[in-house]
Swiss-Prot record:
Recorded family membership: Belongs to the ERG4/ERG24 family.
Gene3D superfamilies in the record: 1.20.120.1630
Catalyzed reactions: 4,4-dimethyl-5alpha-cholesta-8,24-dien-3beta-ol + NADP(+) = 4,4-dimethyl-5alpha-cholesta-8,14,24-trien-3beta-ol + NADPH + H(+); 5alpha-cholest-8,14-dien-3beta-ol + NADPH + H(+) = 5alpha-cholest-8-en-3beta-ol + NADP(+); 4,4-dimethyl-8,14-cholestadien-3beta-ol + NADPH + H(+) = 4,4-dimethyl-5alpha-cholest-8-en-3beta-ol + NADP(+)
Name assigned to this protein: Delta(14)-sterol reductase TM7SF2
Biological role: Catalyzes the reduction of the C14-unsaturated bond of lanosterol, as part of the metabolic pathway leading to cholesterol biosynthesis.
Alphabetized UniProt keyword annotations: Cholesterol biosynthesis, Cholesterol metabolism, Endoplasmic reticulum, Lipid biosynthesis, Lipid metabolism, Membrane, Microsome, NADP, Oxidoreductase, Steroid biosynthesis, Steroid metabolism, Sterol biosynthesis, Sterol metabolism, Transmembrane, Transmembrane helix
Keyword Endoplasmic reticulum: yes
UniProt induction comment: By sterol starvation.
Binding-site list for NADP(+): K311, R315, L338, W343, N350, Y351, D390, C394, L395, Q396, K397, Y398, Y405
UniProt topology in membrane: Multi-pass membrane protein
GO molecular function: Delta14-sterol reductase activity; NADP binding
Domain of life: Eukaryota
């Protein structure tokens, strides 16, 4: 019998019907984007040029490659870490421990790929396998999510997430029942959050760059920019891996299909969309425009990193000279809310930086197609939705102090606009 956890959290994502729709819509959207990027018209909207059959999607070679990739990243996860960090306090007052070695995994992966390429590894062949790889990644996500759902049936009540325990199997399968599913000290959610998907994303980008060099003699400036910008983003996330321990994904959401599919399939195969588009639809880009795009990305990164670093520094040590002079609002929980610095400009300055960078990643693809701007459109919707979830949780947690913060900082993401 499944454990219960008392009062159930309000349903999100449209409840069971919304969850059922997203179970189908998310994979369908991913495959549409993969097909559209390689088609002649490259249309974001409308049917793809051709729908592949199972003989195109299913490949034992792709399955072996995908399982080998997961195995490699799991092995790198188990290597000694430069640091072991404690997570947030759980319902039973305990704290889980997490290895901080994601950046180490990125570097070792890069070294292994470099050695493989020097030995003749045909990395440029990877773009031709994106469809079957995406198919086996999706299949893996469904099977893995079923395992997580079954595992949660015997988990103690204290291990369950605030949401994902509605009693509806489809909704709970989608959202995830258990907060931190583990076997021994291997944390499945933490592993998937930043490892196979993010590192896989930059590897796919590199393969697309290599393929363009094979086809056209050298990679285009636009391809270099997309690869460089997104490598910086992934490297930053893995270098500051410890910060993920305070995010909603880790502290609030259960681990179900939503995060499993997102981490393992959606991220590597849709976030690489700009590089996929450039391989099949090369775009001219001059140095003046490239310089402007670099400036836009640098501005977004400066805001993103500055806001996150300020928040993380304040959480670790409010007396740190870098944040000691910032104005705060006291809360009933004992924690303080920053109301100056980056967090006095808007309530989510890190989201603002994220969106500016998303624009910079799309601009090298030109303005003749909407498809490369899918990430910007999707990420805007995602962050607006996440911001609304943040607002509800913070209001519930901090009460009047949060209302005062919202009065002092009226704009949510973009100053004077939203």
């Amino acid at each position: 019998m499944a454990p219960t956890q008392g009062p159930r959290a309000p349903l999100e994502f449209g409840g069971p019907l919304g969850a059922a729709a997203l179970l189908l819509l998310l994979p369908a959207t991913m495959f549409h984007l993969l097909l559209a990027a390689r088609s002649g018209p490259a249309r974001l909207l409308g049917p793809p040029a051709s729908l592949p059959g199972l003989e195109v999607l299913w490949s034992p070679r792709a399955l072996l490659l995908w399982l080998a990739w997961l195995g490699l990243q799991a092995a790198l996860y188990l290597l000694p870490a430069r640091k072991v960090a404690e997570g947030q306090e759980l319902k039973d007052k305990s704290r889980l421990r997490y290895p901080i070695n994601g950046f180490q995994a990125l570097v070792l992966t890069a070294l292994l790929v470099g050695l493989g390429m020097s030995a003749g590894l045909p990395l440029g062949a990877l773009p031709e396998m994106l469809l079957p790889l995406a198919f086996v990644a999706t299949l893996t996500a469904f099977i893995f999510s079923l395992f997580l759902y079954m595992k949660a049936q015997v988990a103690p009540v204290s291990a369950l997430a605030p949401g994902g325990n509605s009693g509806n199997p489809i909704y709970d399968f989608f959202l995830g029942r258990e907060l931190n599913p583990r076997i021994c000290f291997f944390d499945f959610k933490y592993f998937c959050e930043l490892r196979p998907g993010l590192i896989g994303w930059v590897l796919i980008n590199l393969a697309l760059l290599m393929k363009e060099a094979e086809l056209r003699g050298s990679p285009s400036l636009a391809m270099w920019l997309v690869n460089g910008f997104q490598l910086l983003y992934v490297g930053d996330a893995l270098w500051h891996e410890e910060a993920v321990l305070t995010t909603m994904d880790i502290t609030h959401d259960g681990f179900g299909f939503m995060l499993a599919f997102g981490d393992m399939a959606w991220v590597p195969f849709t976030y690489s969309l700009q590089a996929q588009f450039l391989l099949h639809h090369p775009q001219p880009l001059g140095l003046p425009m490239a310089s402007v795009i670099c400036l836009i990305n640098a501005t977004g990164y400066y805001i993103f990193r500055g806001a996150n670093s300020q928040k993380n520094t304040f959480r670790k040590n409010p007396s740190d000279p870098r944040v000691a002079g910032l104005e705060t609002i006291s809360t009933a929980t004992g924690r303080k809310l920053l109301v100056s610095g980056w967090w006095g400009m808007v309530r989510h300055p890190n989201y603002l930086g994220d969106l500016i960078m998303a624009l910079a990643w799309s601009l090298p693809c030109g303005v003749s197609h909407l498809l490369p701007y899918f990430y910007l459109l999707y990420f805007t919707a995602l962050l607006v939705h996440r911001e609304a979830r943040d607002e509800r949780q913070c209001l519930q947690k901090y009460g009047l102090a949060w209302q005062e913060y919202c009065r002092r900082v009226p704009y949510r993401i973009m100053p004077y606009i939203y």
